[in-house]
Amino acid sequence: MGIFAEAETWVAVAFVILMALFAYLGVHRTVLQALDNRRARIKAELDEARKLKDEAAKLLADYRARRAQAEREAEAIISSAKADAERIAAESKAKLEDFVARRTKTAESKIALAEAQAVADVRAAAAEAAVSAAATILSQSVKGQVADDLLGKGIQEVRSKLN
């Protein structure tokens, strides 16, 4: 029996014939083209993924920059509001102190005026009482024209000294 009786020989012959048939039909070109197409598709997907990653990184950087800017603006607004509030409080305090000082001065003026008026009223009442008492005493003790002249002169003198 020889070499042609062995199963391995026929497997090898079938393999060689199959490979020759594949070569004749151009199967290797179809397989290579399919592999090239797959490689190109994978490369395109990787390029697209890299492009998307770069865009995402730019968007993230832009977001962070905007957020930092917004935080700086918020801090500026807050510090400005605090400064305005402090300024308004200081102005209000100064206005209140000025108002209280003016009211105090006005009240003191009114009190001094009322006090002066009261003193003048008391002096006038005392002068009237003294004049009336002097007139009564003089009219009872001195009679006639001399009494009237003395009485008039005395009343005028008392009034001028007491007022």
UniProtKB/Swiss-Prot annotation:
<dbReference type="GO" id="GO:0046961">
    <property type="term" value="F:proton-transporting ATPase activity, rotational mechanism"/>
</dbReference>
<comment type="function">
    <text>F(1)F(0) ATP synthase produces ATP from ADP in the presence of a proton or sodium gradient. F-type ATPases consist of two structural domains, F(1) containing the extramembraneous catalytic core and F(0) containing the membrane proton channel, linked together by a central stalk and a peripheral stalk. During catalysis, ATP synthesis in the catalytic domain of F(1) is coupled via a rotary mechanism of the central stalk subunits to proton translocation.</text>
</comment>
<dbReference type="InterPro" id="IPR050059">
    <property type="entry name" value="ATP_synthase_B_chain"/>
</dbReference>
<keyword id="KW-1133">Transmembrane helix</keyword>
<protein>
    <recommendedName>
        <fullName>ATP synthase subunit b 1</fullName>
    </recommendedName>
</protein>
<keyword id="KW-0406">Ion transport</keyword>
<dbReference type="GO" id="GO:0045259">
    <property type="term" value="C:proton-transporting ATP synthase complex"/>
</dbReference>
<comment type="similarity">
    <text>Belongs to the ATPase B chain family.</text>
</comment>
<keyword id="KW-0066">ATP synthesis</keyword>
<comment type="function">
    <text>Component of the F(0) channel, it forms part of the peripheral stalk, linking F(1) to F(0).</text>
</comment>
<dbReference type="GO" id="GO:0005886">
    <property type="term" value="C:plasma membrane"/>
</dbReference>
<dbReference type="InterPro" id="IPR002146">
    <property type="entry name" value="ATP_synth_b/b'su_bac/chlpt"/>
</dbReference>
<dbReference type="Pfam" id="PF00430">
    <property type="entry name" value="ATP-synt_B"/>
</dbReference>
<keyword id="KW-0813">Transport</keyword>
<keyword id="KW-0138">CF(0)</keyword>
<keyword id="KW-0375">Hydrogen ion transport</keyword>
<keyword id="KW-0812">Transmembrane</keyword>
<keyword id="KW-0997">Cell inner membrane</keyword>
<keyword id="KW-0472">Membrane</keyword>
<comment type="subunit">
    <text>F-type ATPases have 2 components, F(1) - the catalytic core - and F(0) - the membrane proton channel. F(1) has five subunits: alpha(3), beta(3), gamma(1), delta(1), epsilon(1). F(0) has three main subunits: a(1), b(2) and c(10-14). The alpha and beta chains form an alternating ring which encloses part of the gamma chain. F(1) is attached to F(0) by a central stalk formed by the gamma and epsilon chains, while a peripheral stalk is formed by the delta and b chains.</text>
</comment>
<feature type="transmembrane region" description="Helical">
    <location>
        <begin position="7"/>
        <end position="27"/>
    </location>
</feature>
<keyword id="KW-1003">Cell membrane</keyword>
<dbReference type="GO" id="GO:0046933">
    <property type="term" value="F:proton-transporting ATP synthase activity, rotational mechanism"/>
</dbReference>
